[in-house]
């Protein structure tokens, strides 16, 4: 037995369930992706001047290691 009948068609909700609805689900607007930040230009020519002294020391240390032994 039905629980309740509406008197008019306007009393019914427009969408009763998303699963039973014939309308497609609205898609959210696509957000633009962030661009990568531009890299800073190196000012000095020497490693100690531009802050790359530690990076160069690591490269030299890796080259001097046991990798050269025969």
UniProtKB/Swiss-Prot annotation:
Question: MF terms per GO, please?
Answer: double-stranded DNA binding; nucleic acid binding; nucleosomal DNA binding
Stretches of Basic and acidic residues bias are at 46-57
Listed Basic residues bias regions: 30-45
In its UniProt entry, the species of origin is given as: Oncorhynchus mykiss (Rainbow trout)
Listed A to Z, the keywords are: Antibiotic, Antimicrobial, DNA-binding, Nucleus, Secreted
List the residue ranges of the region (Disordered).
1-70
Q: What is a biological process (GO) this protein takes part in?
A: defense response to Gram-positive bacterium
User: Where is the site labelled Cleavage?
Assistant: 67-68
Name the UniProt record assigns to this protein: Non-histone chromosomal protein H6
Matching Pfam families, A to Z? HMG14_17
Entry GO terms, CC:
chromatin; extracellular region; nucleus
Q: Which family does it belong to?
A: Belongs to the HMGN family.
User: Which InterPro entries does this one have?
Assistant: HMGN_fam
* Stored SMART domains: HMG17
Q: Which compartments is it annotated to reside in?
A: Nucleus
